[in-house]
Amino acid sequence: MPERNPVAPPALPWLAIAGPTASGKTGAALAIARHWRQRGGPPVEIISVDSALVYRGMDIGTAKPSAAERAEVPHHLIDLIEPTAAYSAAEFAADAARLIGEIHGRGALPLLVGGTMLYFKVWLDGIDPLPTADAGVRAQIDQRARELGWPALHAELARVDPITAARLAPADAQRIQRALEVWQISGQPLSSLHTGRSASSAWAHSGLMLSLEPTSRAWLHQRIGERFEAMLAAGLIDEVEHLRARGDLHPDLPSMRCVGYRQTWEMLDGLWPSAELLERCSAATRQLAKRQLTWLRGMPRRQVLACDEPGLVERVLSRADAWQADAR
């Protein structure tokens, strides 16, 4: 069965806050909800656009909104699945489309918040139909990767799908796994299924995306370091130890490849000393932020707000108020 390619005409209004890790998205979103509530405006419900927040039991390392924040403002697409499972961009797009309709049906406004840019892209631009993920096939691929290593599977992919293999690093486990899975299920290379002719989503022109982007890379890097210091103080290592103790997780799962969890797992495996954990997590997050900003630059409809300049919340509220007035 192909993955869902949701198109929802007529598309309803939506507001989104995107940006790299540590840019202040959560604070800005909560500020909008509180601002409109104080002014007698429409209630807000937040739709998480974050591939790490879907996992249960992964709270500290994902900077999951607190129980108090989630009680104050309804949040969706958080704690959806166990960390043994997977959640695709196509599933997100379908769930977001459904939730936007339900939120409008309750007389509220949907606010999409997050930094998983692939989710935004698939939801806004559509996606080619692809085979649904198969847990059995993935387990077989993971087992072979443990025996042979991902570079060997990358070489195998190069034989059956050289176009996809050429754009993937030999250690890009998640994407190599998906490409081999598609090949095994369909008998067709993933590159032949990415036609670029998928129908554009009806959502693309019905809302406003505010993108919080720094003018100073050093500012963002400092925020990232401070964020991980706080996570370590809050018990990130204990959280990963608890996940390891379950006995049903391994480091090749998408959940355990999340930034922070992967590095902590490797440290607990003795691959390098605990004194290096903060810098390794911070470095991986800096690379993630760089990729997020690259994705954002390819989204011409976004409105950029400098997140490292004074008055960010006020500027966000001004743009949100103007959008809300036009969306009535």
Curated annotation (Swiss-Prot):
Gene Ontology BP, a term: tRNA modification
Reaction(s) catalysed by this chain's protein: adenosine(37) in tRNA + dimethylallyl diphosphate = N(6)-dimethylallyladenosine(37) in tRNA + diphosphate
EC number: 2.5.1.75
Single GO molecular function: tRNA dimethylallyltransferase activity
Binding site for substrate: 21-26
Residues annotated to bind ATP: 19-26
InterPro entries registered for this protein in UniProt: Dimethylallyltransferase (IPR039657), IPT (IPR018022), P-loop_NTPase (IPR027417)
UniProt-annotated stretches for the region Interaction with substrate tRNA: 50-53, 174-178, 257-262
Residues marked Interaction with substrate tRNA (site): 116, 138
Enzyme class: transferase
Keywords: ATP-binding, Magnesium, Nucleotide-binding, Transferase, tRNA processing
Cofactor: Mg(2+)
Family note: Belongs to the IPP transferase family.
Functional description taken from the UniProt entry: Catalyzes the transfer of a dimethylallyl group onto the adenine at position 37 in tRNAs that read codons beginning with uridine, leading to the formation of N6-(dimethylallyl)adenosine (i(6)A).
Subunit structure: Monomer.
Official protein name in the record: tRNA dimethylallyltransferase
Gene symbol of the encoding locus: miaA
